[in-house]
Amino acid sequence: METKKTLREGYTTGACATAATKAALTALITGIIQTEATIYLPVGRWATFAIEACEIYGESVKATVIKDGGDDPDATHGAAIVSTVSWAEQPGIHLDGGKGVGRVTKPGLPVPVGEAAINPIPRKMIHETAREVLEQYGISRGVNVIISVPNGEEIAKKTLNARLGIIGGISILGTRGIVIPFSTSAYRASIIQAIQVAKANGCDHVVITTGGRSEKFAMRQYPHLPEEAFIEMGDFVGFTLKQCKRLGIRTVSMVGMMGKFSKVAQGIMMVHSKSAPIDFSFLAAIAEQAGASPELVAAVREANTASQVGEMMQEAGNERFFEILCDHCCLSALREVGGGMTVETSLYTMGGQLLGKAVRNDAGD
């Protein structure tokens, strides 16, 4: 019998930056090149990091850790996370971002506008670790710590940073210090952050999409909305809707395709392919309501995929089917959040043709 392989955890960019800082500061104090650094992670355990490079330049030291995403590598997997530490004229620990670490240009993020995109917990980790090293050696001098990512600007193109107003590089992130393989918490956190940025930039209408292709169609449909109003929710329909409601978004437009939106119409709010099957009897009932022939209704009931149903209804020229399906999506969304907002739904083909749309205002409309 095949045994399930245990997935290997990785480390966050914040943990890598902290380990690199510890190595660089230790080398600056002792003059000894460091090959590893052990730090305490927020998750409550110690971890030892290999130091890829440790270069001493008299009054400053540069140490590098290679980011290891474990068995769930993201865009930053394999990136060099560099900490350059030097003595400061002022007391205290002065942390900033260098080349390849983004700058915050829009409100709504946990870091103020104008500062390096080093999130609060990595900041705290770096400060505390640097303080511990200074105390260990009985040193009271101030230090400058610059975190850089040589290829950060390129890597950032594969992330949502530009949309969130983080320009020039990646963010130094991580609340736990470790990356749990295929956990959804990071994706959910990015959805919340995107809604917060939209809200902080004056958007009370956001467009939530199931992926990049849907988003492209949505941007064409809503050209008047700013870029930060568009949020990729992936499979997390219910979660995203609830966060929009919680954060005071008044109008939510959902844009997607047959496969996932057939599930939303049924009231399924987590639309991963393995989350729940599509109810073809439900789609057949909509086809009947839309005036489809008995033969077409029977064919819908026997279909294999929602896309196939979409093609059948298109060939039959039955636009009403798509309008009713979109209306069901709106009703499901309003039920999920308990009303109190306007919900629009637009349904597209894979090629970008608008099949139908609907709008519902509040729960009882």
Curated annotation (Swiss-Prot):
GO terms for molecular function: cobalt-precorrin-5B C1-methyltransferase activity. Pathway: Cofactor biosynthesis; adenosylcobalamin biosynthesis; cob(II)yrinate a,c-diamide from sirohydrochlorin (anaerobic route): step 6/10. Keywords: Cobalamin biosynthesis, Methyltransferase, S-adenosyl-L-methionine, Transferase. Pfam families: CbiD. Its EC number is 2.1.1.195. GO terms for biological process: anaerobic cobalamin biosynthetic process; methylation. It catalyses: Co-precorrin-5B + S-adenosyl-L-methionine = Co-precorrin-6A + S-adenosyl-L-homocysteine. The keyword Transferase applies. HAMAP family: CbiD (MF_00787). Belongs to the CbiD family. This is Cobalt-precorrin-5B C(1)-methyltransferase. The lineage of its organism: Bacteria, Bacillati, Bacillota, Bacilli, Bacillales.
